[in-house]
């Protein structure tokens, strides 16, 4: 995609998900790219756990501000009530805004305030990423999680899978009682029982 014809004709560098090389190419005259708002994805992942652990309204720090002032605007996320799912919304990265995306591991400004440990004490979380070799997950998503876990007072054990077998992950869930919460990223979406059977022990 990075060729002279694309550059001369302003063709967006789709498929690169606002990775560093795609954003840098915009400065060289390429048309742009798309960001799936990994910073918001990572925040939502851990924020939902934090809210559940604190026993507060699920939208705290999302649709409504928390005590530290963290809040998301409706143009960066969407909640599907039927699916009970939160989604980060894609955003176009262009010559006008690409400088905002030069660091793909920077927490999203409106939700980058430290929580008070007296009201949100440290909790232990087990979180797996189904494929540690995936460039987006390992180079963007996990580094963002690692920054947010500090802000949200969460002590997270990150487990990287091989992207092929569920057992590569489940074999490292030996002592569930050591954790207060779990975030599970399955290799195959029909393998939930492999995890719930371990958590029920």
Regions found by a protein language model. Give the residues of each.
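Short beta-strand elements at the ligand-binding edges of bilobed clamshell
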Residues: 27-39, 43
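Sec-exported extracytoplasmic/periplasmic mature domains
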Residues: 3, 7, 27, 31, ...
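Hinge/cleft segment of the Venus flytrap/periplasmic-binding protein
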Residues: 44, 48-123
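Short, Asp-centered acidic motifs that coordinate Mg2+ and/or phosphate
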Residues: 32, 180-181
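Hydrophobic alpha-helical
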Residues: 1-24, 46, 144-145, 166, ...
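Short helices/loops that flank or line small-molecule/ion binding pockets
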Residues: 24-29, 167-178, 197
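Short, solvent-exposed loop/turn elements at domain surfaces
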Residues: 23-24, 98-104, 133-139
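Extracytoplasmic "Venus flytrap"
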Residues: 124-144, 148-151, 155-172, 176, ...
């Amino acid at each position: 995609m990075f060729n002279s014809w694309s550059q001369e004709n302003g063709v967006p560098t789709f498929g690169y998900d606002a990775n560093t090389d795609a954003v840098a190419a915009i400065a060289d005259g390429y048309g742009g790219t798309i960001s799936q708002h990994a910073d918001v994805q990572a925040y939502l992942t851990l924020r939902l756990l934090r809210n559940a652990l604190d026993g507060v309204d699920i939208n705290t720090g999302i649709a409504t501000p928390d005590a530290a002032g963290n809040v998301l605007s409706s143009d960066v996320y969407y909640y599907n009530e039927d699916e009970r799912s939160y989604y980060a919304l894609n955003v176009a990265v262009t010559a006008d805004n690409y400088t905002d995306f030069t660091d793909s591991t920077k927490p999203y400004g409106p939700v980058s305030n430290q929580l008070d440990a007296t009201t949100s004490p440290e909790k232990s979380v087990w979180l797996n990423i189904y494929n540690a070799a995936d460039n987006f997950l390992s180079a963007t998503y996990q580094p963002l999680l690692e920054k947010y876990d500090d802000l949200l007072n969460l002590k997270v054990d990150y487990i990287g899978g091989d992207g092929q077998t569920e057992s590569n992950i489940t074999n490292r869930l030996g002592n569930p009682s050591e954790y207060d919460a779990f975030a599970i990223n399955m290799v195959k979406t029909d393998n939930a029982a492999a995890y719930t059977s371990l958590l029920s022990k």
